[in-house]
UniProtKB/Swiss-Prot annotation:
Keywords: Glycoprotein, Membrane, Phosphoprotein, Proto-oncogene, Signal, Transmembrane, Transmembrane helix. It comes from Mus musculus (Mouse). Residues 40-109 are annotated as: Disordered. This is Protein EVI2A. The chain crosses the membrane at residues 126-151. The keyword Ribosomal protein does not apply. GO terms for cellular component: cilium; cytosol; Golgi apparatus; plasma membrane. Residues 40-60, 83-102 have a biased composition (Polar residues). It is found in: Membrane. Belongs to the EVI2A family. The modification Phosphoserine is found at residues 197, 203. May complex with itself or/and other proteins within the membrane, to function as part of a cell-surface receptor.
Amino acid sequence: MEHKGQYLHLVFLMTTVWASSSSGTRPNYTHLWASSVTASGSSNQNGSSRHPSDNNTNLVTPAVGHKVSATDKPASSPPVPLASTSTLKSSTPHAFRNSSPTAEIKSQGETFKKEVCEENTSNTAMLICLIVIAVLFLICTFLFLSTVVLANKVSSLKRSKQVGKRQPRSNGDFLASSGLWTAESDTWKRAKELTGSNLLLQSPGVLTAARERKHEEGTEKLN
């Protein structure tokens, strides 16, 4: 009866230890599942393989005694998978951290190159626009100066032609210059004799003698 009581007591202790160990390992399994699937699978296999071994050792220990089972209790807790998972977790972010700065540097270099190319293209476009504007301004000034020079030449030619022409002094001169009256007509001769400086130089006697001669010539023609 004493052996049976000890056996039951050992079984009760082992069940409590197994329950505590399983409750402690469950959060570890869930944490490993969040970090990586492969690590969780390996830890589950290790935990499942170790629990039967613990049960086997516990089954053997009742024959030995209560002291041996007490010494075997600390062996039931599995600290090794936690260390392995922590190393996996610490190693994977470190790799990502090492790879991220290089990608950032490359992206920064590409953006800098793009900005430099855009600045160069904008500068060249500005230079081309300034050159075109300067050329158009020069062409406009050249055309303006050429028109001014041509206008001055035309005005000078008109003035020279007007100076070369003789302006008519009276209506008779204008008609004679235009060719409406012949230069040898009697009316033109009479008007020229009666007007001008010749009339002032002639005396009254000379005029009467000339008239008498003309009158005599007219009577002779009638006879």
